[in-house]
Every structure is written in C-alpha cells, then in structure tokens.
Amino acid sequence: LGLVATRLIPRSKDLWVFGSAVGVGEGAWALWHVAVAHGERAVWLTGSQRDADAARSAGIRSAPKRSLRGFWLTARARVVVITHGAGDVNRYATSGAFLVQLWHGIPLKRLGLDSPVTARAPLPLPGLARLLAYAYARTQRRIRLLPAASHLVRGRLESAFGLGHDRIVVTGEPRVDVLSAGPTESEARAVVESLVGSVAGARLVLYAPTWRDGDRDPAVPTA
C-alpha cells in the first residue's frame, strides 16, 4: 500500500525529513542545520514523546513518524535523511525519495552484508539465510548517498551495504570530524566536569564498546 501511495503522491521540491533511532541527534542533526541554512524546509520525524520533547526544546518542526502526518511528510519529501534504517522515518513511504543514509558509526568491525548476524535465520530452513541476505541487499539499494569519513571506510561501507562507488562519497562525517576538529583537551575536560563534577588531575578514560554482532551491549564496567 505504501509503495502504491508513493507512486501517486508527488514529492515536494524543497521538503526534507529527518529521523534517527536515537532521537534528535547524530549526523542527521548536523545535516539538519546545513539544510536549513540553505533554505530547505525541514521536519524531524519523532518516534517517542522524548523525541518530540527534544524537538520542541530545540525549536524545530516535528511530527510523529508513525502517524498519518508522518507518512504524508515522508511520502512528500524530496530528501529523506536517516542514521540507522528506514524505520527512522515512516518506513512505508521512503520509496522514490532521495535517501541519505548517514549511518551511526565507523565500520571497525564487520557489519551489514559482511556480518553473519545480518542473515542469521531464526529457523533452520534451507535457503532462508540466503533469502534474508538478498532482501537486505535489495533494501539497501534504495540508498542514494552514504557519506564516508575516509577512503578506507568507503571500501568497507561499499561491501557492507552492497552499494556502488557512486553512492558512497568521501565527504567527512560529523561524528568523526569532531574528533579531529573538535574542542581542545581543556575544553573537553570542562565539558566532562560540567556533567560529573570536578575530576581534578585524574586521567580520563573513554569507554566505547563496539557493536556485539547482535548480542546484548556490554555493561558499564564496575572496576
């Protein structure tokens, strides 16, 4: 039904919709500011009341992604920006849009088509894993643009998403750029202390565990 609707509903020339599985943030938030600065109409599609509250606090237009309005906005948007998957916006109305996948990390480990968990079949049926891999690859082909932080990352993303060289462009990536062009050490420490209190001269350690191939994320260390 969604596919039929997107064939009939004309897409706007200047409407962009944004969404992220983790709320108002990620690379989509950085691109939001660029789009708005260039005069594009932008709407953030929310998945929870917390997201809606965050959008309201930021003073930006928003709509629930699972609502009729969320469907309509996604179906009308010329550009759809996501960070995880089509479910970041209204998944039933993305067909035909210029889909920008910003992703949400650096592929230090295997992901997508390169990770066994992607096509892990819930039942031991012959050919099911292959069918799941095919379905995943077909879904990813809707992506029109996927920015990469470097040429090394570009190659890994091409393999993981099954996309050609023309779809993945080395432009830099907001989540990564901040590490090289972000605040100084003293500024970063000040931000930490504003959250946790004074750390005096203590050494600070960043604990950033990677994705566990579909398993539960590791807990915060206690020692």
Regions found by a protein language model. Name each.
Residues 41-47, 79-82, 146-148:
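Short, hydrophobic beta-strand segments that form beta-sheet elements in well-ordered domains
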Residues 13-14, 97, 202-205:
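Nucleotide donor/acceptor-binding cores
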Residues 94-182:
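Active-site-proximal region of nucleotide-activated glycan assembly enzymes
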Residues 46-53, 84-88, 151-152:
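Short, polar loop motifs at secondary-structure junctions
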